[in-house]
Amino acid sequence: MLPSGFLMLPGGVTLALTAMVGEHLFDKIGFKPLLLTSLILLTFILSLFTTISSETTTMTAAILYAAFTIGVGLSIGPVMTLALNQVPKPLHAHGSAISNTINQVAGAIGPALYTSIMTMASQHFIQQSNEANKTLLQIKSMTSGVHTVYYVAIAFAIVSFLLTLTLKKKDQQLETQ
């Protein structure tokens, strides 16, 4: 259990620090450039996660996770701020409550979805494999499942990137109406 804590610690610290930097950059350069940059970073780091295997060291995994949290930290605060800025000031309390609820629900659905995908991909690998060594089969099937999860996450990041390209500033939205 101790190595998993050490694996997550650098990412947690990195996330906390980059969330503060993300808010500052949001004020300085705006939402769209910041989110696009963070999504490019996230996509790149997620693609690196598709190379992990049973041979990957804990240090490598910790570095990858910390790099991943840089992208998350640069995007999560500005996304929440942008969402709340779309709500009229008298309704900010309700907007904040809804935002927090959505965050909690997504936080519950995400791991369940990815675990299901990983399990299905691992089972599919086992069904398609002719590996005789059971231990090696388990390792390979789990690795296949994990890689599949990261490919799905990459797809979500790419879709998010494309959707971000369609966002307009509030004053641009008013001009087009």
Q: Where is each model-derived feature located?
A:
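Short, membrane-exposed interhelical loops at transmembrane-helix boundaries
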Residues: S129-G145
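Intrinsic disorder in cytosolic terminal tails and internal cytosolic loops
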Residues: K134-L137, L167-Q177
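12-transmembrane solute porter fold
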Residues: M1-H124, S144-L167
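Short, polar/charged, Gly/Pro-enriched helix-capping and turn/loop motifs at alpha-helix termini
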Residues: H124-Q127, Q172-Q173
